[in-house]
Amino acid sequence: MSVLWRISNHSDLSGEGGRRGSARWHTRGRPIVYLADSPASAMLEIVHLQDGNGKLPSFYHLLEIRAPEDLPIKDLLTMADAGWKQKLELTQRIGNAWLASLATPLARVPSAIVPRTWNYLLNPEHPDAGHVKIESVVRERFDDRLFRFGPR
């Protein structure tokens, strides 16, 4: 089993958040679940999700997610593809095409935040998406030091 991670206040893999808003690898209206290969990567990927005051909520849920080793994963983009971080429309087009194709339940994409790190996308509409399951959910408090910048 492969282990993937997600930080969310919703303990499901429905992809409903993707229906409500666009992100790096999809446009609004499409169910999708963003996953990371470690809890630390999942934490760093949510930096941009601060509230309007630049703050994160006090608590979060860390989801440990299991996928069978033999579940197909498609690489959507290599880290060598130059300039992709600045081409949001390109990455959204690639992600939307993958979602529509139902080619694989999981896709691997490079992190735009952490160099040489991979993230994963789950297409909840793929027939084999049900094999990807939440193993555990732990409620944790954000460490105040984590996102504090500037003088101490």
Please place each PLM-identified region on the residue numbering:
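Active-site and NAD+-binding cores of ADP-ribose-processing enzymes
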Residues: 1-18, 26-27, 55-152
